[in-house]
Amino acid sequence: LIQMADRGPDSAGVAFYRNPAPAGSSKLTLFSPDEGYDWDLVAGELSGAFGGSNGPEIRASHAVIVVQTDADDAGRWVLDNHPELRLMSAGQAIEIYKEKGDPREFVERFGLRELSATHALGHTRMATESIVTTEHSHPFSTGLDLCLVHNGSLCNHNRLREELRREG
């Protein structure tokens, strides 16, 4: 990410695939703009609703919480009970961390140098058509244990979607 900072100085993000959740459990990565957020409270509530959690793994404005249920149920619970939070990723192994600001600072704030993973996907961003926010930063979660990044503008997405629908 540091080497890519010149190409995209507005924000940075990374998806790590590491430390898979135990069978029957899932892993959520959550974001709060409040860095003093009470992650222990959320982890305790999730544990009470679904069973066991070893507590949150906190990295700057994000927390990873493992719960004993499927990711869809846990994600819905978070959205219903803590609408102030954003679900960055869900699945067995994925953890997505992203933030607006300089990629060099992002690497340090999130302690990324100390992480190891089976694989990772990183992105830096220079916003051209949307505002600079954590939510607009890449990678984007696209499903359980899936994410994507893209370069460029997707200004013709509605036309392409209609073409694809017509083609079946």
What are these regions (language model features)?
Residues 1-168:
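N-terminal segments that mediate ammonia production and transfer
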